[in-house]
Regions:
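A motif-centric signal for short, conserved binding hotspots located
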Residues: 31-446
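Generic start-of-chain signal for non-secretory N-termini
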Residues: 2-4, 29-32
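Helix-centric, low-specificity signal for extended rod-like, repetitive segments
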Residues: 3-5, 21, 41
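Sec-dependent N-terminal signal peptides
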Residues: 12-20
Length: 446
């Protein structure tokens, strides 16, 4: 065979193989840049410390000195936030408002995990009794390090993860999310999560299903067993694999008219235990759960699910419609891992059952919120969530609503944003804590 014929033969062979591969691997979800696995290398890295004829050198580093790992940002979180931070309200992939809004203005992203900008929002107030109190930004969630976006952990409440040993100084986006995601769901029942085997063909966050030949990535690229960032030295590898959950494709949105339902399936609290191991309490035992609410697969809603479904707001437990009852302010885990079932559940508003369970994200947001400990609402003892039908705020027309213990240094608009845009009419005129969604009794109201 002459060289020209050989070249033609090789080209034809490559085209045939390419067509076969395309026919084997299903089309990827168009809105999923990471596609469940590793994205395009040059989105995060630069080969020669430059891009578009501009150097990547930042933050007064000597010209020619590159960022670690040839990243486009000064560090791991900065590189993530290059794409995931922005000022456009409810921009689908944004999880941090940037620039951070000034005092009196609110972060604009409304993803289920919350807006990291709250880590830079400090609230101060004086109570009706004259006591000065505050809620510093560092208390509002997971304190990531990002030099380019001014997120630092030196003011964090904890030097290590509460209930664990993970060092706060090493906290970044990739502490939880594997940027080169190796973790893949191998079957439609999500019974097997592996790091090798079938190639990842799409995201595992939106309901794509594995096939006989391909897998899908883990939920939100979360790391699994033995995962830790390459930059972290020490014995900090994860024990548990990623949770199984499915999000709707439209999730960064106001919930003023309807809830955004992430169908949490299985393993969320057990995964959180990778860093917060001693906080794990998955059985209801007063001697071991004092100060820590039970959560995890065994913390079933058996005794409270009827209250959850009947509850509309404080004092109103009249819902009897079995297709209603769900609230994304108090989500639950379903205790299942079937991907198709979970995908269908993202469109439902039905409430809980006896086999569902409490999880960490029932009360907390994964990233950050307007409240201490990244809770979904103001959980301070004795705090009303509405006063005389209005949200509390420093600008409230109601004197009690102005009081610091209720307003917590926020305007009424800021407060409403922290409730994901819900109008106060969704709640009772004097709304107690949303602990009542499960525990509608005086003992648990405050």
């Amino acid at each position: 065979m002459n060289p020209k014929s050989m070249k033609y033969f090789r080209l034809k062979s490559c085209l045939i193989v390419s067509v076969l591969l395309i026919s084997i691997i299903p089309a990827r979800t168009s809105y999923s840049f990471h596609d469940g696995g590793v994205a395009a290398c040059d989105a995060c890295h630069t080969m020669h410390n430059s891009s578009g004829n501009f150097p990547m050198t930042k933050n007064a580093m000597p010209l020619g000195q590159g960022n670690i790992f040839l990243l486009r940002g000064s560090d791991q979180s900065s590189t993530c936030l290059n794409c995931h931070a922005g000022s456009t309200p409810q921009d689908r992939i944004k999880i941090a408002t940037n620039p951070v809004p000034v005092q009196g203005s609110y972060p604009v992203q409304l993803t289920p995990g919350g807006d990291f900008a709250y880590l830079q929002k400090n609230y101060n107030w004086v109570t009706s009794l004259g006591t000065a109190q505050s809620s510093p930004g560092a208390n509002h969630g997971h304190n990531i390090n990002s030099l380019d976006y001014l997120y630092f952990t030196n003011s964090a409440r904890w030097s290590i993860a509460p209930g664990g040993v993970y060092p706060t100084a090493a906290m970044s986006c990739i502490s939880c999310h594997d940027p080169h995601n190796r973790f893949r769901i191998m079957d439609a029942g999500a019974t097997t999560i592996a790091t090798t085997g079938k190639p990842i063909s799409g995201s595992g966050s939106y309901g794509d299903l594995p096939t006989a030949l391909t897998a899908v990535g883990s939920y939100r690229l979360l790391g699994g067993q033995f995962y830790k960032p390459a930059s972290l030295q020490g014995n900090y590898g994860f024990v548990a694999n990623p949770p199984v959950a499915i999000a709707p494709s439209s999730y960064n949105r106001s919930e003023s008219l309807s809830d955004t339902r992430v169908a949490y399936g299985l393993g969320m609290s057990e995964w959180c235990e990778n860093c917060h191991s001693t906080l794990q309490h998955n059985t209801v035992n007063p001697s071991t759960t004092l100060g820590n609410h039970p959560f995890g697969y065994s913390a079933k809603l058996t005794n409270v699910y009827t209250t959850y479904n009947a509850y509309i707001y404080t004092g109103n437990l009249t819902n009897t419609d079995l297709t209603q009852g769900y609230s994304s302010l108090v989500p639950f885990e379903e205790g299942i891992s079937d991907l198709a079932t979970l995908a269908a559940d993202t469109a439902k508003t039905s409430g809980a059952s006896a086999t569902d369970n409490v999880m960490c994200l029932t009360c907390h947001r994964a990233h950050a919120s307007a409240w201490d400990s990244a809770t979904r609402w103001n959980t301070a003892k004795g705090a009303y969530l509405t006063v005389s039908g209005f949200y509390p705020g420093v600008d409230s027309p109601i004197l009690q609503g102005e009081q610091g213990e209720y307003a917590t240094g926020k305007t009424m608009a800021e407060y409403q944003q922290s409730m994901y845009g819900r109008p106060p009419s969704k709640f009772a005129p004097l709304q107690w804590s949303l602990c009542n969604k499960c525990h509608e009794s005086d003992q648990y109201k405050q």
